[in-house]
Amino acid sequence: MTEVSDRTETRFRRTPGVEARAGKFPGPSLIPSLNAIQARRGWLPREELEELARSARRPRYEIEGLISFYPHFRTEPPTKVSLHVCHDLACFLRDGEARLAELRERYADDADVEVVEVSCLGRCDIAPAVAVNERPAPVSEADVLVQGARESDLGQAAPRTRAEPWANDPYASGSGVGERYAVLRALLAGELDAERIIATLKDSGLRGMGGAGFPTGQKWDLVRRTEPGSVKYAVCNADESEPGTFKDRQILATQPHLVLEGLLIGMAAVGAEEGWIFIRHEYAPEEHVLRAEIEALRAAGVVGADACGSGRRLEVDVFVSPGGYILGEETALLECMEGHRGEPRNKPPFPGTYGLHGRPTLINSVETLADVPVILQRGAQWWADQGAGESVGWKFFAVSGHVERPDVYLVPMGTTVRQLIALAGGVTGGAAVGAVQPGGASSNFIGPDQLDLPLDFDTAVKAGTMLGSGALVVLAEGTDLLAAATNVLRFFRNESCGKCVPCRVGSTKAHELLREVLESGATALGDARRQRILQLEEVMRKTSICGLGQVALGPVVSVLNLGGSTGGGLQAPKSDGASGQPVR
């Protein structure tokens, strides 16, 4: 404890503007210990928490503060069967509310079964989705799984795989650790150096694929140049929790080797010895895939105290999130890893200079890291040539909502909305497109007149939306757009960490206003309510600490714009000519 405390005090002393954080308790994070207790007992009994407080020498109120913040933790024994039902956009569009009502009625008098509404489970491809004792499934399988859970442990679900490998993978299908990790081996053997790797990433134009779009090579260069020779860390952000987003889950299940190689290359390039994959707890099948791959790497000597015989130490592990969409924000993620409540930090400083435990920290998304070994093997020019038109590289998209084949699709960056919907089999039942949310819940809705919009970072922004998390949600013509946007806003309201007033209060007030309109059966929002929404959106966008509050009302405003200046036309507009025809 003394060593950790001394290091923590030094950290606050040398870093401007963070003295207020000195009151936070130093020492190892208690999150993994709490996760372990709940995995063993099914909840967090008082005697276990008292023992943890004694053994870790931490005050009980600190532990209670963690438990009250994170939604995964339970302080009461669960029922024999926990039936979690997703209520967010992709499931909402597939009659999720009706299925939820049916399940509640069916099990209302069953003492063994608890039906709980939850935020997005990351299974939008099987919407409406449920999780029975944490085992994910489509709602059509709920009753069978409930019966199975009454009788025995359901066991772990298998991760979803593909019959054919993704086209981006440079390694032969079925190859093992010995044939993979070629770029990492070359780097550790001295055949490549960090400067060349970073230069190649800069030349390629690779940008962060988690939503921010920050140039990857520039980020790596910043972390590498910050405090050379000091302790540094690296984190893969796999806390994919935004409604409509499930592409990272598929990448982790099918290409764990590319994600881990990208992370390890990043660690070696910036000078970090320790790295983690921070994964949401709902992704247990993918967590097991990652742990198996890490064990294979350790057995082969690729990671450890003497990685690939280079004399360099590279250690990597998995950190399981205790829940909460806010943890996708990089500084909230770091707060969680340090064992605090996952509340975003004020920035600057940024993680590249002041990250985990106050040290320079490289943070990249799953897809970004998976792209790194591909680019370094095939070259920056090859990557640039893969895009459509002026765009660069490949892009994974998760497509859900009113489409025939919800799934993950790998396409050239710059593929149009229309083309992506066509890959997903077109709109369900041959209907016309009414609206599209092209970049996940954070992105603004676009109308059927924008189906030929190329999906890349800059073009999307110019069109008034964003590429975001790579989640394209399709709404058929006739869908109640205000209800859909209100559903999105409810998600942000529920997931707000509550730290800043604009986000906490603004999202609640706006949701109450919209809910009143929907419950009244009104066909128009009206000028007064519209102006109130616009005022709240401006205040939240300009004054919220993190991206959640800044974007929470954007989708609602975009729907109002699609419906006209008075807020009328609350249903998806009729198609106008060829641009709104069904895509098959």
Where are these regions (language model features)?
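Feature of Fe-S/electron-transfer and energy-metabolism proteins
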Residues: 1-584
